[in-house]
Amino acid sequence: MIVSTSVEQSAQFSVKSLTPFGALLEATEDHSDIQQLSIEQLCQLTWEHRLIVLRGFSLLEREELSTYCQRWGELLVWNFGTVLDLIVHQNPENYLFTNGNVPFHWDGAFAEAVPRFLFFQCLKAPEAGSGGESLFCDTVRILQNVSPQQREIWQKTEISYKTQKVAHYGGEITKSLVIKHPITGLSTLRFAEPLNDASVHLNPLYVEVCNLPAEEQNPFINELIENLYLPQNCFAHEWQEGDFLIADNHALLHGRNPFLSNSQRHLQRVHIL
């Protein structure tokens, strides 16, 4: 949802603020070339707004997408390469490749390095009203708005995560809940939400708060999750074919709403370190 008209202008695009955060960059001419835009300017807009959506630009071929993203920085290479196709698999082994929801998480948790940016392009979008929105949570905003007492508790918290590696990630890790953003220096939350009732229960993630009694685990995690989904903290992007979306993977957590099984949802994603 757009809440204000242009807040910044460029000869190549206009910028409109989204609510509760984010910015929409609309090309001044249809089928413009995203490769002609200033990457430095796009980086600054992403740091400022947490995420940017670019609309009215021509899609990139798979190899072209990977080559372009290399101009942003080193790419995280997985067993499938650099470009992940986010589509429904006929016989999925992981919930990412179903039409169920994807709980909030950060990317790169089980990798050697955490990406700075998530870079998406939308090849096919679900029909309006059929679900499949990508969700983003501004964890900087959460930490700025919770009570000092809650912030202090979270700053002392470590959480362990464990999942079997049947897709391109997996293992067992322990991470501090609150970390500093490596670019902006702001405090952020690093949390991965376990599967829930709207999830397809394939390859689940097991979450445990370190040094917390068993009877306090669920209340602690549930309170944290409630903050993630508050309207003032959560942005749902309804995809349109041809959309690009660039997200700050350090400041944001992201997930997905479930969608109809016959929806033709096809995104491509690249991790930029």
UniProtKB/Swiss-Prot annotation:
Its EC number is 1.14.20.11. Binds 1 Fe(2+) per subunit. It comes from the Bacteria. It catalyses: (2S)-3-(1H-indol-3-yl)-2-isocyanopropanoate + 2-oxoglutarate + O2 + H(+) = 3-[(Z)-2-isocyanoethenyl]-1H-indole + succinate + 2 CO2 + H2O. Keywords: Iron, Metal-binding, Oxidoreductase. SUPFAM superfamilies: Clavaminate synthase-like. PANTHER family: GAMMA-BUTYROBETAINE HYDROXYLASE-RELATED (PTHR10696), TYROSINE ISONITRILE DESATURASE (PTHR10696:SF53). This is 3-((Z)-2-isocyanoethenyl)-1H-indole synthase. The gene is ambI3.
